[in-house]
């Protein structure tokens, strides 16, 4: 599924980039951005597995969208703290926006994914 692949790719790129964050961020920004970006994929996987149950599917895609939005907030912090460059931020944010659009399509059209 395209949205899962895009989410997984972004989560891995965020992980690799976050390895460069200061050590004092390990239990705050670093762990939060890793957790939220990975959670996008885990919620997609859980929801897709139970896609025959429309309410469950929509709920999990909505959870995934919320985690995606949280990831964008952490990216804002990473940019403001100068842990990532504007170029990296723009790339990650653009990819996250695309994931959000795909998730919203799935939320609005769950019958297409049964």
Feature-to-residue mapping (PLM):
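Short, C-terminally biased terminal segments at protein or domain edges
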Residues: 1-114
